Amino acid sequence: MRDVDSIRVGTRGSALAKTQTEWVVAHIQQQGIAVEIIEVSTRGDLRGDIPIRQIGSDGVFVRELELALQTGRIDAAVHSLKDLPTILTEGLSLAIIPERATPYDVLVGKTARTLATLPTGSCVGTSSVRREMLLRLERPDLVVKPIRGNVDTRLKNLDAGSCDAIMLAGAGLDRLGLGGRITEILAPPRFWPAVGQGALVIQVRTDDDVTKSKLQFLNHATTHLEIMAERTCLASLAGGCLVPIGALATHAGQELTLGACILEERDGSIRKIEVTLSTSSSLVQGLSSEQKATNLGRMVAARLIEEGALEMLASMRAAEGKQALSG
């Protein structure tokens, strides 16, 4: 019989997912709480040879974990926050967001160590449309190759010569103890990361106050506010985790700043619009920290919309619809 005072924590089966979950579990166990780790396979893991966009819809790395939560198989699920859709599953809560690791994209070069020193025609591998567009905007002379697989697989393929460099999230390399492979950090305003990149989230059932209370010590208030701003911006644009939108919120003292960009490819060229605002604006004075974060997200989204973001999104969705029909 299961110990009713223990917590069953669900995780994906990849090395990175298990490392992230083990970090969470170690902190829970330090509080004297027993933990059982339950591995759950997701659609994104099972179809690792297919580009994410071709699998279809947001949430390909989280749906099965959410189902395990809903059915009571697990009490909490550990996710990479950037994998979560902007529309939350009913009855589930993003209750706990630990302190964020580095949010930046990075380059791992085989010989050349930076984008600037890669020779013309070099091949760069990435699994992200956002990264691909930002890369092509900066170096249109490079060849972009879609890659899938876990971090270790990508590094082995790079070492075997499949590409001259790869782009991925720096946090994943750091968490796996592979930060030494990073040859260049790609930060804003050149490269805006995915919404929530570098952050973990512990998802629980909304009505499970007991588990939420036990795990509350892991919540990092500053990170939580930054994520609220980023996800509010994304939701206001009706974007999902597969849409080429980048955003990053940062704190300096009591001031929260949010920058975001949206990218579109049309007629072979990449268009990028970006906006940066902060809570020093008179429009958010006198509000609570949470209200400031969400209002800031809406304000940045509104500015992007003024610059043409909705038209760009509509154009992308129309193009995707045509591809689906032709496929």
Regions found by a protein language model. Name each.
Residues 50-76:
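Short, structured active-site "lid" loops
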Residues 81-84, 88-142:
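A conserved helix-loop-strand patch within extracytoplasmic ligand-binding domains
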Residues 2-47, 52-54, 137-327:
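Small-molecule-sensing regulatory modules
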Residues 58, 75-80, 164-169:
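Paired acidic/hydrophobic, glycine-rich loop segments that form the ligand-binding mouth/hinge
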Residues 72, 77-83, 197, 203-208:
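Ordered, amphipathic secondary-structure segments that act as subunit-interaction surfaces
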Residues 68-70, 79, 84-89, 297:
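Extracytoplasmic loops/domains of multi-pass membrane proteins
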